[in-house]
Amino acid sequence: MYLIKKLIGGAIGLTAAVGMATAVFAADISGAGATFPFPIYAKWASAYKGVSGNGLNYQSIGSGGGIKQIESKTVTFGASDMPLSVAELNRYGLLQFPTVIGGVVPVVNVRGVAPGAMTLDGATLADIYIGKISKWNDPTIKKLNPSVNLPDQVITTVHRSDGSGTTFIFTNYLSKVSPEWKSRVAFATAVDWPVGIGAKGNEGVAGNVAQTAGSIGFVEYAYAKQNNLAYTKMANRDGKVVSPVAAAFGAAAAGATWDPANGFGTLLTDQPGADTWPIAGATFVLVYKQPQDQAATREALKFFQWAYRTGDQMAAGLDYVPFPDAVKQRIIGSWTQVQGWNGS
Protein backbone atom coordinates (compact mmCIF):
# COMPACT_ATOMS: atom_id res chain seq x y z
CA MET A 1 0.00 0.00 0.00
CA TYR A 2 1.24 3.44 -0.93
CA LEU A 3 0.93 5.75 2.05
CA ILE A 4 0.23 9.42 1.56
CA LYS A 5 1.71 11.38 4.44
CA LYS A 6 -0.75 12.33 7.16
CA LEU A 7 -1.95 15.87 6.85
CA ILE A 8 -2.65 16.24 10.55
CA GLY A 9 -0.80 14.22 13.16
CA GLY A 10 -3.16 11.83 14.88
CA ALA A 11 -6.09 13.13 12.85
CA ILE A 12 -7.01 12.68 9.21
CA GLY A 13 -4.63 11.00 6.80
CA LEU A 14 -4.88 9.90 3.22
CA THR A 15 -3.98 6.39 2.21
CA ALA A 16 -4.20 4.87 -1.20
CA ALA A 17 -3.29 1.64 -2.87
CA VAL A 18 -2.78 1.80 -6.61
CA GLY A 19 -6.29 1.70 -8.06
CA MET A 20 -8.00 2.48 -4.76
CA ALA A 21 -11.21 4.36 -5.54
CA THR A 22 -12.22 6.24 -2.42
CA ALA A 23 -10.79 8.15 0.50
CA VAL A 24 -13.29 9.01 3.24
CA PHE A 25 -13.25 11.04 6.40
CA ALA A 26 -15.87 10.87 9.07
CA ALA A 27 -18.99 12.16 10.01
CA ASP A 28 -22.10 14.33 9.61
CA ILE A 29 -22.17 16.56 6.50
CA SER A 30 -22.10 14.45 3.32
CA GLY A 31 -20.24 15.36 0.15
CA ALA A 32 -18.50 13.62 -2.72
CA GLY A 33 -16.38 14.41 -5.72
CA ALA A 34 -13.07 15.97 -6.66
CA THR A 35 -9.83 14.55 -5.28
CA PHE A 36 -8.09 17.86 -6.15
CA PRO A 37 -9.31 19.63 -2.94
CA PHE A 38 -9.37 16.59 -0.66
CA PRO A 39 -6.22 17.54 1.30
CA ILE A 40 -7.63 20.93 2.28
CA TYR A 41 -11.19 19.66 2.84
CA ALA A 42 -9.72 17.04 5.18
CA LYS A 43 -7.72 19.63 7.08
CA TRP A 44 -10.66 22.01 7.33
CA ALA A 45 -12.93 19.17 8.43
CA SER A 46 -10.65 18.17 11.29
CA ALA A 47 -10.44 21.74 12.57
CA TYR A 48 -14.17 22.35 12.12
CA LYS A 49 -15.02 19.19 14.05
CA GLY A 50 -12.96 20.53 16.93
CA VAL A 51 -14.76 23.87 17.12
CA SER A 52 -18.30 22.88 16.13
CA GLY A 53 -18.66 19.20 16.93
CA ASN A 54 -19.91 18.64 13.38
CA GLY A 55 -18.02 16.36 11.05
CA LEU A 56 -17.79 15.91 7.31
CA ASN A 57 -18.15 12.68 5.36
CA TYR A 58 -16.49 13.47 2.03
CA GLN A 59 -15.92 10.75 -0.56
CA SER A 60 -12.89 11.59 -2.69
CA ILE A 61 -14.12 9.80 -5.82
CA GLY A 62 -13.38 12.26 -8.62
CA SER A 63 -15.33 15.15 -10.10
CA GLY A 64 -17.38 12.94 -12.41
CA GLY A 65 -18.58 10.87 -9.46
CA GLY A 66 -19.34 13.99 -7.44
CA ILE A 67 -21.50 15.43 -10.21
CA LYS A 68 -23.38 12.13 -10.53
CA GLN A 69 -23.96 11.89 -6.78
CA ILE A 70 -25.32 15.41 -6.39
CA GLU A 71 -27.52 14.96 -9.46
CA SER A 72 -28.90 11.74 -7.93
CA LYS A 73 -29.33 13.53 -4.57
CA THR A 74 -27.34 10.98 -2.60
CA VAL A 75 -25.09 13.63 -0.97
CA THR A 76 -25.63 17.12 0.40
CA PHE A 77 -22.99 18.65 -1.86
CA GLY A 78 -21.01 17.62 -4.89
CA ALA A 79 -17.50 18.79 -5.72
CA SER A 80 -15.97 19.29 -9.15
CA ASP A 81 -12.90 20.96 -10.63
CA MET A 82 -14.83 21.32 -13.88
CA PRO A 83 -17.38 24.12 -13.53
CA LEU A 84 -20.82 23.28 -14.83
CA SER A 85 -22.39 25.56 -17.42
CA VAL A 86 -25.33 27.82 -16.58
CA ALA A 87 -27.56 25.53 -18.65
CA GLU A 88 -26.45 22.49 -16.64
CA LEU A 89 -26.90 24.31 -13.33
CA ASN A 90 -30.39 25.44 -14.32
CA ARG A 91 -31.35 21.98 -15.54
CA TYR A 92 -30.76 20.48 -12.10
CA GLY A 93 -31.53 23.53 -9.97
CA LEU A 94 -27.97 23.71 -8.63
CA LEU A 95 -25.90 26.53 -7.17
CA GLN A 96 -22.15 26.47 -7.85
CA PHE A 97 -19.35 28.28 -6.05
CA PRO A 98 -15.55 27.96 -5.85
CA THR A 99 -13.61 27.25 -2.65
CA VAL A 100 -9.87 27.50 -3.42
CA ILE A 101 -7.45 27.75 -6.34
CA GLY A 102 -4.70 25.22 -6.93
CA GLY A 103 -2.26 23.96 -9.51
CA VAL A 104 -2.00 20.75 -11.50
CA VAL A 105 1.65 19.75 -11.86
CA PRO A 106 3.48 17.18 -13.97
CA VAL A 107 5.39 14.71 -11.78
CA VAL A 108 8.13 12.38 -12.99
CA ASN A 109 10.06 9.35 -11.81
CA VAL A 110 13.31 9.69 -13.72
CA ARG A 111 16.58 8.51 -12.22
CA GLY A 112 18.60 11.44 -10.87
CA VAL A 113 15.91 14.07 -11.49
CA ALA A 114 15.00 15.96 -8.32
CA PRO A 115 11.88 18.08 -7.72
CA GLY A 116 12.00 21.16 -9.92
CA ALA A 117 15.08 20.01 -11.86
CA MET A 118 13.25 19.34 -15.13
CA THR A 119 11.46 21.91 -17.31
CA LEU A 120 8.69 21.15 -19.78
CA ASP A 121 6.48 23.28 -21.98
CA GLY A 122 2.92 22.71 -23.14
CA ALA A 123 3.73 21.44 -26.62
CA THR A 124 6.24 18.93 -25.28
CA LEU A 125 3.86 17.75 -22.57
CA ALA A 126 1.15 17.21 -25.18
CA ASP A 127 3.52 15.26 -27.43
CA ILE A 128 4.52 13.05 -24.49
CA TYR A 129 0.86 12.24 -23.74
CA ILE A 130 0.09 11.71 -27.43
CA GLY A 131 3.02 9.28 -27.63
CA LYS A 132 5.07 11.22 -30.19
CA ILE A 133 7.82 11.68 -27.60
CA SER A 134 8.49 8.27 -26.10
CA LYS A 135 11.95 8.48 -24.47
CA TRP A 136 13.35 10.79 -21.83
CA ASN A 137 16.44 11.62 -23.88
CA ASP A 138 14.34 12.84 -26.82
CA PRO A 139 15.99 15.93 -28.38
CA THR A 140 12.95 18.09 -27.59
CA ILE A 141 13.21 17.36 -23.86
CA LYS A 142 17.01 17.69 -23.95
CA LYS A 143 16.73 21.14 -25.55
CA LEU A 144 14.58 22.30 -22.62
CA ASN A 145 16.97 20.71 -20.12
CA PRO A 146 20.56 21.10 -21.37
CA SER A 147 22.10 20.60 -17.93
CA VAL A 148 20.02 17.55 -16.92
CA ASN A 149 21.39 14.05 -17.51
CA LEU A 150 18.40 12.44 -19.22
CA PRO A 151 18.46 8.64 -19.60
CA ASP A 152 17.72 6.57 -22.68
CA GLN A 153 14.54 5.33 -21.01
CA VAL A 154 11.02 4.70 -22.28
CA ILE A 155 8.42 7.16 -20.94
CA THR A 156 5.37 5.63 -19.24
CA THR A 157 2.51 8.11 -19.06
CA VAL A 158 0.06 7.85 -16.16
CA HIS A 159 -3.39 9.40 -16.36
CA ARG A 160 -6.68 9.28 -14.50
CA SER A 161 -8.99 6.36 -15.16
CA ASP A 162 -11.98 7.96 -13.43
CA GLY A 163 -14.06 11.02 -14.30
CA SER A 164 -11.74 13.74 -13.10
CA GLY A 165 -11.72 17.51 -12.79
CA THR A 166 -7.93 17.32 -12.61
CA THR A 167 -8.08 15.66 -16.04
CA PHE A 168 -10.39 18.44 -17.22
CA ILE A 169 -7.90 21.12 -16.16
CA PHE A 170 -4.93 19.24 -17.62
CA THR A 171 -6.56 18.42 -20.97
CA ASN A 172 -8.08 21.90 -21.24
CA TYR A 173 -4.55 23.27 -20.97
CA LEU A 174 -3.17 20.82 -23.55
CA SER A 175 -6.01 21.75 -25.93
CA LYS A 176 -4.98 25.40 -25.70
CA VAL A 177 -1.29 24.80 -26.41
CA SER A 178 -1.41 21.91 -28.90
CA PRO A 179 -3.65 21.98 -32.00
CA GLU A 180 -3.00 18.26 -32.49
CA TRP A 181 -4.16 17.48 -28.94
CA LYS A 182 -7.26 19.63 -29.43
CA SER A 183 -8.24 17.85 -32.64
CA ARG A 184 -7.31 14.30 -31.57
CA VAL A 185 -8.21 14.21 -27.88
CA ALA A 186 -9.82 17.53 -26.79
CA PHE A 187 -10.75 18.10 -23.15
CA ALA A 188 -13.24 16.68 -20.66
CA THR A 189 -13.33 14.97 -17.28
CA ALA A 190 -12.65 11.72 -19.16
CA VAL A 191 -10.93 11.40 -22.55
CA ASP A 192 -9.63 8.63 -24.79
CA TRP A 193 -5.96 8.70 -23.84
CA PRO A 194 -3.70 7.82 -26.80
CA VAL A 195 -1.13 6.05 -24.61
CA GLY A 196 -0.37 5.22 -20.99
CA ILE A 197 -1.87 3.59 -17.93
CA GLY A 198 -4.80 4.76 -15.83
CA ALA A 199 -5.19 5.16 -12.07
CA LYS A 200 -8.06 6.31 -9.88
CA GLY A 201 -7.80 9.64 -8.12
CA ASN A 202 -4.88 11.97 -7.57
CA GLU A 203 -3.86 9.40 -4.97
CA GLY A 204 -3.67 6.63 -7.54
CA VAL A 205 -1.71 8.67 -10.06
CA ALA A 206 0.76 9.72 -7.36
CA GLY A 207 1.17 6.10 -6.29
CA ASN A 208 1.72 4.84 -9.83
CA VAL A 209 4.33 7.48 -10.61
CA ALA A 210 6.18 6.76 -7.36
CA GLN A 211 6.31 3.05 -8.17
CA THR A 212 7.01 3.18 -11.92
CA ALA A 213 10.49 4.04 -13.14
CA GLY A 214 10.47 6.31 -16.17
CA SER A 215 6.92 7.50 -15.59
CA ILE A 216 5.19 10.88 -15.78
CA GLY A 217 1.81 11.82 -14.35
CA PHE A 218 -0.17 14.89 -13.32
CA VAL A 219 -1.58 15.64 -9.87
CA GLU A 220 -2.75 18.54 -7.76
CA TYR A 221 0.35 20.06 -6.19
CA ALA A 222 -0.45 19.05 -2.60
CA TYR A 223 -0.20 15.39 -3.67
CA ALA A 224 3.21 15.97 -5.26
CA LYS A 225 4.46 17.75 -2.17
CA GLN A 226 3.05 15.28 0.37
CA ASN A 227 4.56 12.35 -1.53
CA ASN A 228 7.94 13.92 -2.30
CA LEU A 229 7.41 13.44 -6.02
CA ALA A 230 9.67 15.16 -8.54
CA TYR A 231 7.49 17.88 -10.03
CA THR A 232 8.58 19.75 -13.14
CA LYS A 233 8.80 23.45 -13.85
CA MET A 234 6.77 24.74 -16.79
CA ALA A 235 7.33 27.33 -19.49
CA ASN A 236 4.18 29.47 -19.46
CA ARG A 237 2.31 31.44 -22.09
CA ASP A 238 4.76 34.34 -21.78
CA GLY A 239 7.69 31.98 -22.32
CA LYS A 240 8.88 32.28 -18.72
CA VAL A 241 9.90 29.20 -16.73
CA VAL A 242 7.95 29.06 -13.47
CA SER A 243 7.85 26.75 -10.46
CA PRO A 244 4.58 25.38 -9.05
CA VAL A 245 4.08 27.62 -6.03
CA ALA A 246 0.97 29.22 -4.57
CA ALA A 247 1.90 32.68 -5.86
CA ALA A 248 2.07 31.31 -9.41
CA PHE A 249 -1.31 29.58 -9.02
CA GLY A 250 -2.80 32.83 -7.74
CA ALA A 251 -1.28 34.79 -10.62
CA ALA A 252 -3.38 32.70 -13.00
CA ALA A 253 -6.49 34.27 -11.45
CA ALA A 254 -5.27 37.86 -11.73
CA GLY A 255 -7.74 38.68 -14.50
CA ALA A 256 -10.64 36.54 -13.26
CA THR A 257 -13.99 38.25 -12.62
CA TRP A 258 -15.74 35.49 -10.60
CA ASP A 259 -19.27 36.30 -11.70
CA PRO A 260 -22.12 34.62 -9.78
CA ALA A 261 -24.30 34.93 -12.88
CA ASN A 262 -22.35 32.12 -14.56
CA GLY A 263 -21.82 30.07 -11.41
CA PHE A 264 -18.35 31.59 -10.94
CA GLY A 265 -17.32 29.29 -13.79
CA THR A 266 -13.93 30.73 -14.72
CA LEU A 267 -11.13 28.64 -16.27
CA LEU A 268 -7.54 29.51 -15.31
CA THR A 269 -5.44 27.48 -17.76
CA ASP A 270 -2.81 29.09 -20.03
CA GLN A 271 -3.33 32.58 -18.63
CA PRO A 272 -0.96 35.46 -19.46
CA GLY A 273 1.61 36.80 -17.02
CA ALA A 274 5.31 36.27 -16.46
CA ASP A 275 4.74 34.68 -13.04
CA THR A 276 1.70 32.57 -13.95
CA TRP A 277 1.55 28.79 -13.54
CA PRO A 278 -0.10 27.59 -16.75
CA ILE A 279 -2.09 24.60 -15.39
CA ALA A 280 -4.13 26.22 -12.62
CA GLY A 281 -7.78 25.93 -11.69
CA ALA A 282 -10.42 26.55 -9.08
CA THR A 283 -12.40 23.78 -7.45
CA PHE A 284 -16.17 24.08 -7.05
CA VAL A 285 -19.01 23.00 -4.76
CA LEU A 286 -22.52 22.16 -5.98
CA VAL A 287 -25.66 22.36 -3.82
CA TYR A 288 -29.35 22.39 -4.60
CA LYS A 289 -31.18 25.73 -4.53
CA GLN A 290 -34.24 23.90 -3.22
CA PRO A 291 -32.70 21.04 -1.24
CA GLN A 292 -34.72 18.11 0.01
CA ASP A 293 -32.94 18.43 3.36
CA GLN A 294 -32.61 22.14 4.08
CA ALA A 295 -30.97 21.57 7.45
CA ALA A 296 -28.20 19.42 5.95
CA THR A 297 -27.52 21.94 3.18
CA ARG A 298 -27.46 24.76 5.71
CA GLU A 299 -24.86 22.85 7.75
CA ALA A 300 -22.74 22.29 4.62
CA LEU A 301 -22.84 26.01 3.81
CA LYS A 302 -21.96 26.86 7.42
CA PHE A 303 -18.89 24.63 7.07
CA PHE A 304 -17.73 26.47 3.95
CA GLN A 305 -18.56 29.84 5.50
CA TRP A 306 -16.34 28.92 8.44
CA ALA A 307 -13.61 27.79 6.01
CA TYR A 308 -13.76 31.11 4.14
CA ARG A 309 -13.47 33.01 7.41
CA THR A 310 -10.84 30.97 9.23
CA GLY A 311 -9.29 28.48 6.82
CA ASP A 312 -6.97 30.61 4.69
CA GLN A 313 -3.82 29.78 6.61
CA MET A 314 -4.57 26.06 6.43
CA ALA A 315 -5.14 26.35 2.67
CA ALA A 316 -1.92 28.27 2.16
CA GLY A 317 -0.04 25.64 4.16
CA LEU A 318 -1.00 23.10 1.50
CA ASP A 319 -0.20 25.52 -1.35
CA TYR A 320 -3.79 26.25 -2.27
CA VAL A 321 -4.75 29.87 -2.90
CA PRO A 322 -7.63 31.32 -0.87
CA PHE A 323 -9.97 33.79 -2.52
CA PRO A 324 -9.80 37.50 -1.70
CA ASP A 325 -12.28 38.66 0.92
CA ALA A 326 -14.33 40.59 -1.65
CA VAL A 327 -14.81 37.44 -3.75
CA LYS A 328 -15.68 35.40 -0.66
CA GLN A 329 -18.39 37.90 0.24
CA ARG A 330 -19.74 37.67 -3.31
CA ILE A 331 -19.80 33.87 -3.00
CA ILE A 332 -21.55 33.88 0.38
CA GLY A 333 -23.99 36.48 -0.95
CA SER A 334 -24.99 34.08 -3.73
CA TRP A 335 -26.17 31.57 -1.13
CA THR A 336 -29.37 33.58 -0.61
CA GLN A 337 -30.62 31.57 -3.60
CA VAL A 338 -30.56 28.42 -1.43
CA GLN A 339 -33.85 27.77 0.32
CA GLY A 340 -33.32 27.50 4.07
CA TRP A 341 -30.05 29.46 4.21
CA ASN A 342 -30.36 32.19 6.82
CA GLY A 343 -26.90 33.70 6.61
CA SER A 344 -25.24 31.76 9.42
What role is predicted for each listed range?
Residues F25-S344:
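Flexible loop/hinge segments at secondary-structure junctions
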